[in-house]
Amino acid sequence: MISALAVRLPNWLGDTVMAEPAVRGMRRAHPQAQVLLAGPWATVLGGQGLADTLVTYPRAWSGRLAAADVVRRLAPDTAVLLPNSVESALAAWYWGAGRRIGFDAGVRGKVLTDVVALPEPRRHQIDEYLMLAERCGASADDAEPTLTPPPADGAARAEARALLAEAGAHGGRRTVGVHLGAAYGPAKTWPAERVAELCRLLDTVGARAVLLGTAAEAPAAAAIAAEAPAASLAGRDRPALLPSLLAELDALVSGDTGVAHLATALGTPVVALFGPTDPALSAPRGRAVALTHPVPCAPCFYRVCPIEHPCLRGLEAKRVRDAVLALLKSAPPPRPALRQQ
């Protein structure tokens, strides 16, 4: 019987969201166990009844050592390692976990006690995480990430609504977020002229486009908003506010990003644009549609396109608009206009 279970979460936001079904399955399989989740985005899975303890596992090595000590004090008897790194396997050994479950990826297999062979061909990331959860006794009967949004009457949701109202949203119109960035690299980014065209097309059908992204994307978002009917919240959608902001949207358009996975898990419909990566491996599951433009070089998995970016440049704004409208047809009616305070 497992009494203390430590789960090393992936390092990226989207991968962490895709790990939710596996974590949920392990929690259900071992209700008596103390469950600890460790990873850079562990707090994303907080408040969901999935864990007793969350440990933010930072990227900096100095911070990781301190976090490893926190996990070690829990004295886990079992560790499930979702990343395929040597570091995660060594960390589990340092934690003192007698049972260490992970994929056989290179030399790390020598540190694991339960080695799971990577599937060939590779499967969707969600399904691969579920393979590890099954080794831990979990069921793989639910493979769709689900997160409960922040409370509608909470402070974070109120702040999100205020930001959207400032951006001209929720005036009885559909609000469509358009996320510009991708931590993976510029090869995942839809061209700015396509984004501007989408904003114009959405405006013609009575929808308000709101541009999202980090502070690094703020200049590009401002340039788009200057020539198209859209407002920019880029740089203002900080991580702590992001779940509330996404929950307030009627739909989201995004590249293959963690934000797309988070929005879908929260119940917001998503149109995900895929170029250099493979939707068969990482498309959002739920109320989402993945769009691609077939070209011979895709998926290349390059972070920077060495040619003219044909995969995403070939995705026409009208096609994206039509996909958004199809999702909105099955969505609840738009929210009423906000009262002026």
Language-model-derived ranges and their functions:
Residues 1-341:
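Catalytic machinery of carbohydrate-active enzymes
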